[in-house]
Amino acid sequence: KDGSGGYVFAQYEFDAYENNDNYDWLDAVTRTGVEQNHALSFSGASEKGAYYLSFGYSNKKGMVKNLGDTRYNGRINSDYSIKSWLKVGTCLLYTSPESEIFSDDGVYDKARGANPMLPVDSEIYTLNYGGIEDNNYFNPIRTLKIENDRRRNRLSSTNFLNINPLKGLNIRTSFSLDFFQEDRFKYTPKDIQESIRYSQDGQAEHTRDQRMVWQWDNSISYDRIFGKHKINALFSTSATQTDRDYTYATGKGYGTDRFSYYNIGASYKTDERSIGSDFVTATLMSYVVRADYNYASKYYLTATARYDGSSKFAKGHRWGLFPSFSAAWNIAEENFMKEQRVFNQLKLRLGYGL
């Protein structure tokens, strides 16, 4: 007995002690994890181009019951020289993972910390030590009844065109697109402690996060060497737009668990329904001019200017000019440094920029 005259141990604990019983709650919520991966690829090349195709499938069954992941993916890489001065290429990637994940209430940790003298029982709502009920210590076997699924789709593509019309002159344009969508579905049944404690009588949730980003880059560069003089000039532009759509819906109170998260609007607790959305579009535009000059790999001059604009800033403050200048002296290339053995590289550089 304890100081108040009550029993420290409950009767079931005395029985387990007398019968030398030891109950493994962890075994009740775990299994042997299995993972399988399959891949198929094709590739080829010629003097004018090359290609690569791959397809993959993977399936994982986690150590905790109901924990799993199925994934499909595909990839295409290709580049081709249409003419000696014209080259095109593309890269396409698709992934589609689908996951069944257990509730955030910590199935594994609760089972690992369960009372080893408490008989494994899926019908009790909480795990107890002694005769004390702990409403925070949910039965992990019942927690496995929570449906918590996630589906993702992602498609990304990058394409380019490269032109070399004259010696030293390069013109390049590239366009990339990245689309991502994630759906999360969760249903907490009405007859488990997580629902009973918070008077949910069943709760259904659905969230969707969708994003699309596109970027278009263009550049013209000229690179030539005239005796000891080397020049490089670049002009480039970049435009990016990001669109994000986010929606969510939650319902509480269901007469049956039969419909899971498929009919959120059927909840009878209408004052506890929740729905919301968020739509955001952001754009970024950049212009870059750069000129490099060096003489005999000794003396260097560089001038750069960026002109950037972003829709995230207030009107009247969306554009900014950022110039920079630098000069360098490669002292190690001077004749008076040839005989010394202390330095193999010594350069002095000064720069200024915003």
Put a short name on every predicted segment.
Residues F55-K61, L301-F313, L350:
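Transmembrane beta-strand segments that form the barrel wall of outer-membrane beta-barrel proteins
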Residues K1-D21, T32, G62-S156, R172-M285, ...:
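Surface-exposed loop/interface segments of Gram-negative outer-membrane beta-barrel transport/assembly proteins
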Residues Y51, Y287-A305:
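Short, contiguous hydrophobic alpha-helices characteristic of membrane insertion segments
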Residues G44-S46, Y57, Y80, L92, ...:
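Residue-level signature of outer-membrane beta-barrel architecture
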Residues V29, N37-N59, M63, R75-S81, ...:
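Predominantly transmembrane beta-strands of Gram-negative outer membrane beta-barrel pores used
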Residues S41-S43, S54, N77, T158-F160, ...:
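Outer-membrane beta-barrel architecture
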Residues K315-W319:
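Short glycine/threonine-rich loop-to-helix capping motif typified by GTGT followed
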Residues E35, A39, K60, L284-Y287, ...:
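Conserved interaction-surface patches within small, structured recognition/assembly domains
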